[in-house]
């Protein structure tokens, strides 16, 4: 174990952040699994295997190179939600952006995975704001990836007190480009998840 990891492991503040990350991420994954099941039950032929995919959802966040930066990403959201003024350590912002880029490029439930691009895939100033000067091409996403993406959006929306429909309205054809058929599918699946 490197001295850096040992020092962080001994830091009670870091341990508190790590515990929150684990609790929040596990809760998110469980929510995604619930919606993956709901969507596979809705159309078991079209979304066969979605339940199993839900079981693997975001597991990469618990491994290098994602885990450490995502502990800070998650803590940053918690502080923002709690109205706490908090800044990550110097140099961590870049690592947080790199980890997010790595995550979206290596997990097929993100449109960026399918776009064939490896730079400028997130807005480094505000990861939740669409990057207006560059739209990511999500038109190659298969339906099962779209279904997992919707399960993810609904879960995050529930966590943040927002709706996946609002997120879709804000981001479709602003952050991510989809075909009309994909767009219709996204809204249909959001309705399946949020409508009942």
Please report, for each region that a protein language model flagged, where it lies by residue.
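Metal-dependent phosphohydrolase cores
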Residues: 1-196
């Amino acid at each position: 174990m490197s001295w850096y990891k040992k020092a962080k492991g001994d830091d009670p503040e870091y341990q508190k952040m790590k515990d929150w990350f684990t609790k929040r991420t596990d809760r998110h994954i469980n929510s995604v699994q619930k919606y993956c099941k709901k969507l596979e039950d809705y159309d078991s032929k079209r979304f066969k295997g979605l339940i199993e995919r839900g079981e693997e959802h975001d597991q990469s966040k618990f491994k290098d190179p994602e885990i450490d930066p995502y502990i800070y990403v998650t803590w940053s959201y918690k502080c923002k939600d709690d109205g706490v003024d908090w800044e990550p350590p110097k140099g961590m912002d870049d690592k947080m952006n790199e980890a997010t880029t790595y995550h979206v490029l290596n997990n097929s439930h993100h449109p960026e995975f399918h776009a064939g691009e490896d730079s400028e895939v997130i807005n480094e100033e505000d990861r939740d704001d669409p990057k207006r000067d560059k739209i990511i091409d999500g038109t190659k996403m298969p339906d099962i990836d779209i279904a997992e993406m919707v399960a993810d959006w609904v879960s995050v929306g529930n966590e943040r007190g927002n709706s996946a429909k609002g997120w879709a309205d804000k981001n479709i054809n602003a952050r991510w480009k989809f075909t009309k058929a994909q767009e219709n599918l996204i809204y249909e699946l959001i309705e399946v998840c949020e409508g009942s």
